[in-house]
Amino acid sequence: MTKILVLYYSMYGHIEALASAVAEGAKKVADVEVTIKRVPETIPPEAFTKAGGKVDQSAPVASVQELVDYDAIIIGTPTRFGNMAGQMRNFLDQTGGLWAEGKLYGKVASVFTSTGVGGGQEMTITSTWTTLAHHGFIIVPIGYGIPEIGDISQMQGGTPYGASTIADGDGSRIPNENELKIARYQGEHVAKIAKKLKD
């Protein structure tokens, strides 16, 4: 059984929605077990609520040590100034012990994100790849494997690096169907590769 972790941070629910779609896609692949977890919140609860953060996220919180249990990890993070969110950064910064022992070496990884218009979706994904490369992950982009990536009939996310969604300033725009299709494709694509490598 190939084990896949969809690991995310979501403040307003955009990444949470993409994470569900990624997991849905991965579950299409036979003999694959998919788990969705989120990283711990670092913003004090009162401040998080005041900022409009989505408090009713059902995914359990992940621990750093459990990362070794998975064959593939698909990371979802919103953009913060062209980088991953601080909550994801804080979580990954705690993987030094795993790095020192090579515990994540050779595992599969992929990244998806949410940004504002011109917010750096590609930069966020590729800057997250840097951390993954230091661990020796096999990084899986999605290329142009799904036609929705090239759809210019509407404003949308989606890059050859990974799925994404465009979030407006007040968080009211939710992922559209094309963005969710791309996320499902990413999950399925990564699951197929992880399974092949494990077999």
UniProtKB/Swiss-Prot annotation:
Top enzyme category: oxidoreductase
Flavodoxin-like domain boundaries: 4-190
Annotated positions binding NAD(+): 12
Cofactor note: Binds 1 FMN per monomer.
GO MF annotation terms: flavin adenine dinucleotide binding; FMN binding; NAD binding; NADH:ubiquinone reductase (non-electrogenic) activity; NADP binding; NADPH dehydrogenase (quinone) activity
Catalytic activity entry: a quinone + NADH + H(+) = a quinol + NAD(+); a quinone + NADPH + H(+) = a quinol + NADP(+)
Sorted UniProt keywords: Flavoprotein, FMN, NAD, NADP, Nucleotide-binding, Oxidoreductase
Cofactor(s) named in the record: FMN
Domain of life: Bacteria
Stated family: Belongs to the WrbA family.
HAMAP family: NQOR
Designated name of the protein: NAD(P)H dehydrogenase (quinone)
Provenance organism: Photorhabdus laumondii subsp. laumondii (strain DSM 15139 / CIP 105565 / TT01) (Photorhabdus luminescens subsp. laumondii)
Lineage: Bacteria, Pseudomonadati, Pseudomonadota, Gammaproteobacteria, Enterobacterales
